[in-house]
């Protein structure tokens, strides 16, 4: 974070090296950074491992934080409640907290504008369940004082009309 085009909008160069799919963004002309995303299968449990790196290709010192966004449709998103923090806020319709978990069901499509939930999460994970499939994102658990400015450790964005949800997590800033 901050969000640069090379993270989420520019095309990536793809290559396969042994058992790793490597995607490399072109240098972003505005930010001066390039992003590499590596995907592999864990030999331990067959989960998909993702490793991101951000390279500063400019001559200026940068202060950045990793950011990951996963877009999903339908279902139910959830994560364990983290520390109390001033950034914890939400205007997401239908989201609620119960038994130490935050639950966000996919909306019915009546929301006219985007909605956003900002929070901390305990244990470094968030998940989404839809039609018999469970997707779990695991990431380093960070303290509230390590979160990028005006962001949450985890965030859920609900697109207008409930077209999709974004499950977002930030790393140490």
Tell what function each PLM region has.
Residues 46, 57-173:
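A contiguous, surface-exposed recognition patch within enzymatic or periplasmic domains that forms
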Residues 53-54:
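Hydrophobic beta-strand positions in extracellular immunoglobulin-like domains
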């Amino acid at each position: 974070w901050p969000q640069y085009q090379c993270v989420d909008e520019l095309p990536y160069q793809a290559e396969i090296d042994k058992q790793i799919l490597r995607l490399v963004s072109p240098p972003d002309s505005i930010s001066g950074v390039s992003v590499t995303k590596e995907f592999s299968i864990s030999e331990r449990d067959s989960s998909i491992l993702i490793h991101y790196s951000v390279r500063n290709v400019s001559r200026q010192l940068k202060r950045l934080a990793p950011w990951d966004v996963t877009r999903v449709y339908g279902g139910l998103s959830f994560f364990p409640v983290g520390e109390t923090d001033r950034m914890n806020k939400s205007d997401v319709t239908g989201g609620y907290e119960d038994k130490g978990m935050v639950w966000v069901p996919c909306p019915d499509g009546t929301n006219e504008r985007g909605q956003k939930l900002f929070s901390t999460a305990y244990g470094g994970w968030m998940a989404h369940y839809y039609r018999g499939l469970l997707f779990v994102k695991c990431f380093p658990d960070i303290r509230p004082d390590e979160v990028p400015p005006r962001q949450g450790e985890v965030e859920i964005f609900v697109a207008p009309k409930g077209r999709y949800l974004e499950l977002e997590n930030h790393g140490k800033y």
